[in-house]
From Swiss-Prot:
Protein purpose: RNA chaperone that binds small regulatory RNA (sRNAs) and mRNAs to facilitate mRNA translational regulation in response to envelope stress, environmental stress and changes in metabolite concentrations. Also binds with high specificity to tRNAs.
Keywords per UniProt: RNA-binding, Stress response
Name this polypeptide is given: RNA-binding protein Hfq
A GO CC term attached to the entry: cytosol
Domain Sm residue range list: 9-68
Biological process according to GO: regulation of DNA-templated transcription; regulation of RNA stability; regulation of translation, ncRNA-mediated
InterPro entries with a match to the protein in the record: Hfq, LSM_dom_sf, Sm
Gene responsible for this protein: hfq
Organism per entry: Pseudomonas aeruginosa
PROSITE patterns recorded: SM
Family membership: Belongs to the Hfq family.
Record carries keyword Zinc: no
Superkingdom as given in the UniProt entry: Bacteria
């Protein structure tokens, strides 16, 4: 795991596993809402009434609907696929 993903992957994986509703703001200002179904190095699959593949390069901010507790650093992160 590269250093840049040491926070991103566990955070997204926690949101996915706990099915936390999120708002994703894109760099062009558009707001998307749903639950993270899956993710990889380049994209997030966001599910609401439809599934949308969102490229991470287009994302500005990910805002969970409730506070999220990250797993402790001594546990390895699981892959982002369901």
């Amino acid at each position: 795991m590269s250093k840049g993903h040491s926070l991103q992957d566990p955070y997204l994986n926690t949101l996915r596993k706990e099915r936390v509703p999120v708002s994703i703001y894109l760099v062009n200002g558009i707001k998307l809402q749903g639950q993270i179904e899956s993710f990889d190095q380049f994209v997030i699959l966001l599910k609401n009434t439809v599934s949308q593949m969102v490229y991470k390069t287009a994302i500005s901010t990910v805002v969970p609907s409730r506070p999220v507790r990250l797993p402790s650093g001594d546990q390895p992160a699981e892959p982002g696929n369901a």
